[in-house]
UniProtKB/Swiss-Prot annotation:
This is Dihydroorotase. The active site is at D304. InterPro entries: Amidohydro-rel (IPR006680), DHOase (IPR004722), DHOase/Allantoinase_Hydrolase (IPR050138), Dihydroorotase_CS (IPR002195), Metal-dep_hydrolase_composite (IPR011059), Metal_Hydrolase (IPR032466). Keywords: Hydrolase, Metal-binding, Pyrimidine biosynthesis, Zinc. GO terms for molecular function: allantoinase activity; dihydroorotase activity; zinc ion binding. PANTHER family: ALLANTOINASE. Pathway: Pyrimidine metabolism; UMP biosynthesis via de novo pathway; (S)-dihydroorotate from bicarbonate: step 3/3. It comes from Bacillus mycoides (strain KBAB4) (Bacillus weihenstephanensis). Zn(2+) 2 binds at D151, H178, H231. Belongs to the metallo-dependent hydrolases superfamily. DHOase family. Class I DHOase subfamily. Zn(2+) 1 binds at H59, H61, D151, D304. Its cofactor is Zn(2+). Substrate binds at H61, L62, R63, N93, N277, H308, F322, G323.
Length: 428
């Protein structure tokens, strides 16, 4: 099916929002211009809505295989499509871990059969993410590994991390890291700060993250490796990354919507839906994240979509697993709380969610350019809705944002020229 989207707005190559039509033919973007006509295309009048590149998320947890009670590839990618995401990168904390030929082939088969959006899987750095034996990077790359990471457990052994970075560098691949120094975690469930002190909870200190990033940056410099930092959350981490970039070290970084919108002062009680890793930090950390995003220290926004069951989250803040869902709330949360408040522009938000992650990892995504694959999101910037977890397509309903009123909701997502998700009656 060919589609002609009429009367839309999009961000052009100069970074300006302008009026446009957009023609999709044979799964590709055929033309982007005003007043397009086409004979054999279904015309969809978007009536002034934003035509954006499909959103790109480099940090997601789909749980399959092994955690299908939390999420599946089918439910997770449907939720991604509803949130406007057309390309997502799946972390390897599955069971089994994609750490060998057999496991990666099985994962890719599942993705091919079930995914509603483009899914790029990470390969594990070490076997079973155990930190002691390196995986076969060459084989994992041949089988489509997006990059290499041990995700939420991190690589604690510096010699192992250096060896991994050297091998990744030879393959022109990135090493991606969740940064925590295990000896400093302190069995924490929240940030070590006012909230932990008030509620008598063990806290995770900020230096737990920043000291690990500092170590890895020096290792990346020695290995000449592209090193990407997951979900930056502290003022110290921003400073270390900024200094590294000024020194010419190949480091990039992401921040989550929840760390841009919330800090520890916003946690109303010991609610497990506010438990994520890294935890919500202090006001100074929150301000540093905004500053880092604006000055280029932080390159992109990624959701860290981490679904859990209601039963798991009901165990209380100390026992419940870390993580919140992110796909279906990311854009409206950021548009309402950053763009509408004048902290960043709409153009910047689009870049942080599209071309910045795509360019960082060399993906053919993130731009509405003629000839490219038609991965597109239509967003109604005027639509206001209340976040209601019962409407989520994700199995995970674990969000701290229930009841928040937000503007700027995706209404249609196109993947490879086909409609992957559409809000009922939004475009008629």
């Amino acid at each position: 099916m060919n589609y002609l989207f009429k009367n839309g707005r999009y961000m052009n190559a100069e970074g300006t929002i302008v009026a446009t039509d957009l023609l999709v033919q044979d799964g590709k973007i055929a033309k982007v211009a005003e007043n397009i006509t086409a004979d054999n295309a279904e015309v969809i009048d978007v009536n002034g809505k934003l035509i954006a590149p499909g959103l790109v998320d480099v940090h997601v947890h789909l749980r399959e295989p092994g955690g299908e009670h939390k999420e599946t590839i089918e439910t997770g990618t449907l939720a991604a499509a509803k949130g406007g995401f057309t390309t997502i990168c799946a972390m390897p904390n599955t069971r089994p871990v994609p750490d060998c030929k057999e496991h990666m082939e099985d994962l890719q088969k599942r993705i091919k059969e079930k995914a509603h959006v483009n899914v790029l899987p990470y390969g594990a750095i070490t076997v079973r993410q155990a930190g002691s034996e390196m995986t076969d990077f060459e084989t994992l790359k041949e089988l489509g590994a997006f990059a290499f990471t041990d995700d939420g457990v991190g690589v604690q052994d510096a010699s192992m991390m250096l060896a991994a970075m050297k091998r990744a560098s030879k393959l022109n691949m990135a090493v991606v890291a969740h940064c925590e120094e295990n000896t400093l975690i302190n069995k924490g469930c929240v940030h070590e700060g006012k909230f932990s002190e008030k509620h008598g909870l063990n806290g995770i200190p900020s230096v737990c993250e920043s000291v690990h990033i500092a170590r890895d940056i020096l290792l990346a410099e020695a290995a000449n490796c592209h090193y990407h930092v997951c979900h930056v959350s502290t003022k110290g981490s921003v400073r270390v990354i900024r200094d590294a970039k000024r020194a010419g070290i190949k480091v990039t970084a992401e921040v989550t919507p929840h760390h841009l919108v919330l800090c520890e002062d916003d946690i109303p009680s010991a609610d497990p839906n506010f438990k994520m890793n890294p935890p919500l930090r202090g006001k100074e950390d929150h301000a540093a994240l905004i500053e880092g995003l604006l000055d280029g220290t932080i390159d992109m926004i990624a959701t860290d979509h981490a679904p859990h069951t209601a039963e798991e989250k009901a165990q209380g803040i100390e026992r419940a697993p870390f993580g919140i869902t992110g796909f279906e709330t990311a854009f409206p949360l950021l548009y309402t709380n950053l763009v509408k408040k004048g902290i960043i522009t709409l153009e910047q938000l689009i870049q942080f969610l599209t071309e910045k992650p795509a360019d960082t990892f060399g993906l053919e995504a993130g731009r509405l350019t003629e000839g490219r694959t038609a991965d597109i999101t239509i967003i109604d910037l005027e639509q206001e809705e209340e976040i209601d977890p019962t409407t989520f397509l994700s199995k995970g309903k674990n969000t701290p944002f229930a009841g928040w009123k937000c503007q700027g909701w995706p209404v249609m997502t196109i993947v490879g020229g086909k409609i992957a998700w559409q809000k009922e009656s939004a475009l008629v």
